[in-house]
């Protein structure tokens, strides 16, 4: 890459981005309250009036950023191969280390603010090493006004860009560390300090050896030339910048909320300052012969407490008339309120989502209007989610390429507390490249504390009769969900109660064992008693059955003998005088004819 090409490309890209950059700078001025033009401000100050600025733009931006900061985000890496599951768990832990670094939240909030106000958010990831060669991935939000994108790029995330330019201002010491003593750097004096203006350009160029595209870095100055060039600064040949555009117009210029809100904001400021002037002013018309001295009359009537002398019959003949501005004030106030409502609609919010509703409605109606009022934020949330996926994908790529040394990391887990883990100490925790999918879920926290309390109460009412053992463990979750300041105290109280219960259980363990042994012996005795009774009843049943069978046999024998005896009596009449033979039963009693009279003596 030669110096002339760098100059021409930067000039073309910068001129194309100049409109969007100027709009972004103006949006920052409006956000910080500098909304009145200088000529209007001078007129207001000459009148002795206090400038009035109703910064609805800042209210809306801060409200949306508040919703975004409080949103719930979950990032998870899912491997495409089953054998990479253990490695993916390790990479998920390293992503948590990346998220929990001190500069992460600050950079992401700055990114969200720039994206929302001006329509462009830029994040830079960089790989750094300490003196022990421990690797760390740094994150930083880049100012959009100092960042230039390839003017041919049309993608929302600039994935089709061929080059990026970042304008830097570095001190003399930083320049020496960056370029060394052998490079002549062009400095300028700013506030008695030598500052070097440097342009950092990244180009996507084709490598003939690897037959693939890679990003190369060039550090140069528009007047001096190229200070330093680096071929493929990163091992994976990636570019460290992640870009997101909120909206783009027909000329491919990015923009944010400011473009739609600015006309309404200007009218509101104009109306407020105009009404402030009209409330303290009046219009007077008088005939020349109605006053003694015109100059004195005008000067006197301009005072708050004025006593002026007029000619006789001047008031009676209505030669002096005062006109107020009440009608104009009402019309101007009504138009200003209409512009406020239109401004909220353009921002995608309503009074409920802004926390400005004063109408009396049910809780369900307010919740529904609040949810519908946040639907306008989906474009912004979708842009940030897509950008977050690209950030985490690049971070994982850097981790797989540079985390080759044995290191120990610490992450803070809400459930497990501080947790330490080691990488590259053995084959099981060795970091290596893999194919993966990123799953990112984000959800806005729209429920108020009262709504959460109501939902948790309903859930506890359902679970208490079914699973009462789960209720104590759900109480800390409920308090944590409602951001209660006593969550830690409740957790400590539950842990103390569980510890005391455990101590009592250990102290009563011998007595409980004795009681359990006695209960086992009692159960064994009861079982033996039941078995004995069952055996007794079984023997009695068998005996009764045997007796019944014997009775049947004896009855049959007796009947046979009687039939034989009757036959003998017919042949031998003398047998009538002989005593009859008694029938015997099994229990040696006289047999009776009646079935129910067996074994009975009468």
UniProtKB/Swiss-Prot annotation:
Forms the portal vertex of the capsid. This portal plays critical roles in head assembly, genome packaging, neck/tail attachment, and genome ejection. The portal protein multimerizes as a single ring-shaped homododecamer arranged around a central channel. This is Portal protein. GO terms for biological process: symbiont genome ejection through host cell envelope, short tail mechanism. Its main location: virion. It is found in: Virion. Keywords: Capsid protein, Coiled coil, Viral capsid assembly, Viral genome ejection through host cell envelope, Viral genome packaging, Viral penetration into host cytoplasm, Viral release from host cell, Viral short tail ejection system, Virion, Virus entry into host cell. One of its GO terms (cellular component) is viral capsid. The keyword rRNA-binding does not apply. Homododecamer. Residues 567-602 are annotated as: Disordered. Residues 324-352, 486-542 form a coiled coil.
